[in-house]
Amino acid sequence: MPYPFKLPDLGYPYEALEPHIDAKTMEIHHQKHHGAYVTNLNAALEKYPYLHGVEVEVLLRHLAALPQDIQTAVRNNGGGHLNHSLFWRLLTPGGAKEPVGELKKAIDEQFGGFQALKEKLTQAAMGRFGSGWAWLVKDPFGKLHVLSTPNQDNPVMEGFTPIVGIDVWEHAYYLKYQNRRADYLQAIWNVLNWDVAEEFFKKA
């Protein structure tokens, strides 16, 4: 949905991802962090009515065409809104333990299996210095790639379609895991929703 952007519902209670992601982290992450991105994105766009009907993905793909005074705000807050909107959908109580369907086939063909993908995606997440995201993405030619982005940059800015995104900002895990990013990354595999990832893959 375009402007005014709204904070999406999670679709599950904050405590639903325990013990892997604690309820307090989920509440603060959703209400405070994601909520701030939505508020700031709307504030940036308020004085440009011609942009009010534009989806956030389109804004991010065409940052250079936006008024210069809002490019950074849209990049940071539009990226934060899109990234988290995807992230909440990709988490589920109990998780879908492994990829299915067409996505599973593509992973097997391009990475040599799910375990190899897990290792590659975890490496991308561990290797992201500071704040950012690790992604499984699909390119315009149908191939899968693993990459990481800084801050709140989204792969759509580089022409990719996100399939799975893992938040490695400290606010995603610090209350429970402190500086132990590796422990958080090990835990998050228990709650990733591969059914939704399959849905994203088919639509890409």
Curated annotation (Swiss-Prot):
Cofactor annotation: Mn(2+)
PROSITE patterns documented for this protein: SOD_MN
Catalysed reaction, written as an equation: 2 superoxide + 2 H(+) = H2O2 + O2
GO molecular function, one term: metal ion binding
Record note on cofactor: Binds 1 Mn(2+) ion per subunit.
Binding positions for Mn(2+) per the UniProt entry: H29, H84, D167, H171
Alphabetical list of Pfam families matching this protein: Sod_Fe_C, Sod_Fe_N
EC number: 1.15.1.1
Record InterPro entries: Mn/Fe_SOD, Mn/Fe_SOD_BS, Mn/Fe_SOD_C, Mn/Fe_SOD_N, Mn/Fe_SOD_N_sf, SOD_C_sf
Transmembrane is among the record's keywords: no
Assembly and binders: Homotetramer.
Function of the molecule: Destroys superoxide anion radicals which are normally produced within the cells and which are toxic to biological systems.
Protein name, as recorded: Superoxide dismutase [Mn]
Organism, scientific name: Thermus thermophilus (strain ATCC 27634 / DSM 579 / HB8)
